[in-house]
Amino acid sequence: MTAPTAEALVTLQDLEAAADGLRGIAVRTPLLPVDALTERFPAGVWVKPEMLQRTGAFKFRGAYTFLRGMSAADRARGVIAPSSGNHGQAVAYAARMYGVA
């Protein structure tokens, strides 16, 4: 395995831009405490129910962000997601939001 290059590392600025682009688009899913597990472990245990997200999975966030970052010309060429699972559903849903086939 090779070490990532500086260009490949995700920055705080990248994360903030992605969050800004998803505001009003992605469902803001809650953080829920799991009291039964918190009682057993020395730290609080929380879950984020991403099944409440569009397409039922967190993968929508990445798919939408990726399409948002594409140029209109590239989006017009279409997208392919070699998956029939959560990733494929998320890409298809995000593509439909952009009018992409």
Report each predicted region and the residues it spans:
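PLP-dependent amino-acid enzyme catalytic core
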Residues: 1-101
